[in-house]
Amino acid sequence: MKKYWIPLTMLWFVLVAASPEPQWTLHTVQPGETLSKIVRLYLPYTAAYTKKELVNSIKSINGIDENLSPGQTIRVPVVWDAPLKPKTVPKAKNYMAKGVYMNPSSAGTRTILDTGYKLRLRGANTVVFDAKDDMGAITYPSNLKAKYFPNEDYTPNIEELPKMIDYLHHMGVHVVARMVVLKDPIMAKINPEWCINREKNWLNPADPNVQEYLLAVVRELSDSGVDEIQLDYIRYFADTKTATGMDGVSRSDTIAGLLKKIHDITAPKGVLLSMDMFGIVIWQRDVDVLVVGQDISKLKPYVDIISPMLYPSHFSKGFSGIKNPADDPYLFVYDGIKRMKDLVGDEVVIRPWLQAFPLHVTKGFGPGYIETQIKAALDAGATGWLLWSPENRYNYSFEAMQNVMNYKPETKVASLGGKGTPQKVSNKPNETDVIEQQPVPATTNGVNPPHVDLQPTVPPEAKQSSLPPLRPVANSKPFFRSIP
């Protein structure tokens, strides 16, 4: 274990020694200016992740409180002369993404950075954050607000999307923007005529206005620097109906057409496109396809990755003769992936969502439960995996990740047509790299090792800002904590 940690420690010392001195700019308080207004002006040019962090840092550096006087000069710890402009890190669609979901609250704080760091130590590499959530809210400062929801009064959870992406990229984290597509309470309230089911806040995917809005969000995200856009709820509401309002056009045709338009935006920019899918849809029963419109044969040309939601707890009791599917995680994950691979062949990568929450589990939920699902996914031929905990409780998950770092998938034979645990047939090596095999240090004296990339590089094409010139202050200390 020590042999992996020593090179990392040496690398950190080298980079820290080469880091530039902290930089500051002097700001003269104007009449009517508050500390909050000043922070909003400078936040993109500092290493602070949130406005609250920067407020506290300015107060500490200058020995002041919230009260400011016109003409007063304060130091602001500016480290860049232009806002960050992260770029997408293009990857092949069979990139072995292994990671977790982060809700808007976590993404709006250093929790997401701390999680990215913990993932990298345990051989994982991916964070999925909500860019457009289940309530229809865009979770970052968007340029679309003025046109589409000018009167909506809400504060985005993520104050600095470019900074979040840049910091995660510097950790080697694959950044995925989750976009809830057709379930949208905000737009349903503003434009009820856009809905196909107003009671359920479900937008009509065939409506040109709906498509225009959704494509605008996709364009904005594609230009933000994220590495992948993941579409959720890109389907009709499960209402037992099959009509679209257009003669000769099925629900599956409509969903496939919308997906194609989205793919036409993401593909030229090197942004991967993935979509979530009900676990039950994998069985492709006619009634499910006709109602929700997710016909895999029509969708697969326009998506790079499909993430079936194979949560054992979401299968009804007695499904395929299994008394409580939540207590048989290996069988449902393994068989679901096998069925999906039979449907899409090699055209689309399968990367499942796995259950990292205890719903309906009666036989001991813990690290072993999550580890079992990961092994089932890899044994079935999945390319990576994602863990879902709505509350982002991942302590069990981190332990499971540690346990499967060097796992070699096993080829097995299983089918939910029968019962029993799949039997091992043969072994095959798994896909992993040197970085992902680095173990967690046995001890760090109670302190996480500092992250090495404290000051991401400003892109060369960034324009000069109109802020005052930077003025390094001698013998000053950087306010910015290590990432995370």
Features from the language model and the residues they span:
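Glycoside hydrolase catalytic-domain groove-lining segments
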Residues: V249-M277, I282-R285, V291-L359
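Primarily a LysM-type cell-wall glycan-binding module
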Residues: S19-A47
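Substrate-binding cleft of secreted/luminal carbohydrate-active enzymes
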Residues: V303-F315, P329-Y330, R339, D346-G417, ...
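Active-site-adjacent "subsite" loops/lids of carbohydrate-active enzymes
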Residues: T88-A107, I165-D166, A177-S224
